[in-house]
């Protein structure tokens, strides 16, 4: 039985609830089933799927929708049955109500989205199937948006992006529904919605200007200014709590931002506003939290306007956005004092909580602007300055550690944001502006003993009081202190009461330090503290290295610590090497790899080897071979060298490493140089002995020969030497050559002339193709020997 028959049998009328799931798995995992299906089997499969979709049973309907989902991946099936599939799915949307399981609606919309994706881009299918049904689909999906907002908005977002003209009549209705979501009109506040739902709401809101027929870029720019002006209006509410006059620059910054009056001049009015006017009542703390909720919602919406990617040909107001963020960070209790009517500590604490949420939203917006990279580099100093406003300080410009730990989530995002902006540059010349952030990061990862320390301190105070009391009341009967037993655990096992640093905070600090040590030269104090934190991380992960892998963030930090040690007396290589055993960069420091030495082909060595083999040949044979084809000699030398290398590699019995080959080549070259030096010394010694031991007639006959023959004779002497084991010279041919000259004493002139002619011809041939160099001629020595020969005559 074939697989398609199993599929058809599984979706038959008498199918069970367990049989349809394996069929769906087969169709999803094996795409060749639908490619090899026959026409009759395809008709049966399509008809059975449509019957399941039209069924009144919820499970059967769900099975039919998912079957169409799998069949939509085949173009042939979509071309033949796409109209039927579209009609069946639209019928499911029309019949849906709140009493039906929401999974039916979700699967139906997802199946429609897949079917539209397969049809989109194909002109014939789009014209015949999608275009006639598109308006109906938009209407039905917008009508069910309150049941499953995320799924419906995903489909509507695709329709707006690919079919803006068709969606234009529905733009205002969709905008109204989105504003209801932003205001929390469906019973759930926007800030309490899932992250994915908030994202798709803001993305859909930001892409609506694309449907404008005329100047969509201008519409997008007006929307961005409206959002910024609304945020500015909400921030002005803090003027009721703080004295803005304490910071003279704050008023100037607010004046640069568009306000409600400018928005009214543009003709927008209150129609484009997202939120209504705020009503603050100190007796209702929830009204104060509405400030941070609205600011967070508007900043998220502004983020998707800037980086959403709906309209690409627009001019981004980066300067205006940075000014808005500077205003957000400047509203801070560190620089502004509370007004006299805000005296309640609880109200001040609530206002501080609202400010922390507002600052967190501003940091998230600033981090999202990293998409523009190079355009932000000229503003780096301004960005670091405005972020420094958030660092809490106490007297003597010290970090308020308690405030940092209390608002850990805010400062963890702050440190991570600074690290992300450091990644935009290769180096920072002035590291003084980053020192406060380094102190904040070090405070976040310091061992925390808040609860245990307080309990320990109170226990110590209690013991001190008891001791003082016992001294004053010596006569009273001693009673057992019931609270001493629990306090003893704190005193003896203090490490068990330490708080654990959250993983998210630890990852943010590790990334920040990884960027800082590579691009900033820190002061010695901060550098030593940073290195201490890194070593502490090494110690913590050293014992667990065998049980779990080192996280990537920590691995990068340790490698950068080795590459950028900072001060010479600090070296973390030993402990880092014990943790990152398999890291290729660390292994280079532990085992340096020297490059392989280059191999040089020594011409003198190859010629010496060739001459040694020709010692027993006659003088005429040697002269003929010497004046032969040099190219042939070079080829023979190369072959000999190759044979020696092959034999050496075979004799070794194993493959040598690059380091061993380099050492072997170096030793071979040293041996060759020593051999050449010994040969030169032997030749010089032979020439000297020949000059002193020769008879006058012998010297006369030798010096009578022409200068060219003497040069040739010197060349023969240099090339006819054999060196023994201990550097002694043996088996020279000087004797035989000299004896030949003495026996032919009468024919010296003729031989000299003939040899001179042959040498001239040989010299011409050598100049054409020979690689041998003519030895140097000692002109002064030849002249002296000629004069001595003439006197002897």
UniProtKB/Swiss-Prot annotation:
Pfam families referenced in this protein's UniProt entry, alphabetically: RIX1 (PF08167)
Keywords: Nucleus, Ribosome biogenesis, rRNA processing
GO cellular component, as recorded: nucleus
Biological processes annotated in GO: rRNA processing
Keyword Endoplasmic reticulum in record: no
InterPro entries in the record: ARM-type_fold (IPR016024), RIX1_N (IPR012583)
Ranges annotated as biased composition (Basic residues): 471-481
UniProt subcellular location: Nucleus
Disordered: annotated span: 452-484, 621-659, 672-704, 749-793
Compositionally biased residues, Basic and acidic residues: 672-694
UniProt biased composition (Acidic residues): 630-646, 762-793
Subunit (UniProt): Component of the RIX1 complex, composed of IPI1, RIX1/IPI2 and IPI3 in a 1:2:2 stoichiometry. The complex interacts (via RIX1) with MDN1 (via its hexameric AAA ATPase ring) and the pre-60S ribosome particles.
Homology family: Belongs to the RIX1/PELP1 family.
Function per UniProt: Component of the RIX1 complex required for processing of ITS2 sequences from 35S pre-rRNA and the nucleoplasmic transit of the pre-60S ribosomal subunits. Regulates pre-60S association of the critical remodeling factor MDN1.
Protein name as it appears in the record: Pre-rRNA-processing protein RIX1
Organism of provenance: Lodderomyces elongisporus (strain ATCC 11503 / CBS 2605 / JCM 1781 / NBRC 1676 / NRRL YB-4239) (Yeast)
Taxonomic classification: Eukaryota, Fungi, Dikarya, Ascomycota, Saccharomycotina
Gene this chain is encoded by: RIX1
